[in-house]
Amino acid sequence: MTIPYTPGRLDGKVALVTGSGRGIGAAIAIQLGRLGAKVVVNYANSAEHAEKVVAEIKAHGSDAVAFKADMRRVAETAKLFDDAVAHFGHLDIAVSNSGVVSFGHLKDVTEEEFDRVFSLNTRGQFFVAREAYRVLSEGGRIILTSSNTSKDFSVPRHSVYSGSKGAIDSFVRILSKDCGDKKITVNGVAPGGTVTDMFHAVSHHYIPNGEKFTAEERQQMAAHASPLHRNGFPEDIANVVGFLVSKEGEWVNGKVITLDGGAA
């Protein structure tokens, strides 16, 4: 007896999420698992965090595995995708989430800092998309991660990071054309301020004289930037990704969706 399809479900699908040991990436991996997908959890540093995500996905009734790979290294990216297919038999969804943040006035930015940011946020994501195209099943999904600072929200001393994410907007638009021959959609999400450990570490940069306020005060100020008067959380991003990679999300293609609760 064939089980009827439930809208929004990802049963039978396999997803890979880069940088999914914590924060937004972890929330995305867990959400895709809840929707029924088997998930490859990728991490670059902490196996402990990644294994916790794997355990949570399994607790919800799906399957998951953690693989270490640095998205700055294209050979490791390619091997990660090969390992994902070898482990689960196929791959349907690739979510590129790995990234680093950077702040600095133009006069102080070094070549090393520029390369550190662009090698992961921009170059790394491009080659994740390339490897995803290579192995994804027909009708697959690719999601890249931009930022609301790429075009909607201007922050002083944030040019390198914002520029690294602005390139993603162009990648999404053009790669959606390249991937059409395999019926693969390519979209992006552009989170605004989202409460994670990274948020608390850098939130003072986004608020004038932010160092004068406590982390809790800065979080409250960020909440009031949205007309909904609440903060964004990783689950808010994960819910949108869950839709974009579903059957129902197919007609959204080549688009970057800003997720900031209307703050920008």
Curated annotation (Swiss-Prot):
This protein's record includes keyword RNA-binding: no
Alphabetical UniProt keywords: NADP, Oxidoreductase
Active-site residue numbers: S146, S147, Y161, K165
The enzyme's E.C. designation: 1.3.1.-
Source organism superkingdom: Eukaryota
Residues noted as binding NADP(+) in the record, renumbered to the chain: I24, D70, N97, R130, Y161, K165, T196
GO biological process terms, semicolon-separated: secondary metabolite biosynthetic process
GO molecular function: oxidoreductase activity, acting on CH-OH group of donors
Metabolic or biological pathway: Secondary metabolite biosynthesis
Family annotation (Gene3D superfamilies): NAD(P)-binding Rossmann-like Domain (3.40.50.720)
InterPro entries to which the protein is assigned, alphabetical: NAD(P)-bd_dom_sf, Sc_DH/Rdtase_CS, SDR_fam
Role noted for this protein: Short chain dehydrogenase/reductase; part of the gene cluster that mediates the biosynthesis of the tetrahydroxanthone dimer neosartorin, which exhibits antibacterial activity. The two different monomeric units appear to be synthesized by the same set of enzymes, among which the Baeyer-Villiger monooxygenase nsrF is the key enzyme for the divergence of the biosynthetic routes. The pathway begins with the synthesis of atrochrysone thioester by the polyketide synthase nsrB.
Homology family: Belongs to the short-chain dehydrogenases/reductases (SDR) family.
Protein name (database record): Short chain dehydrogenase/reductase nsrJ
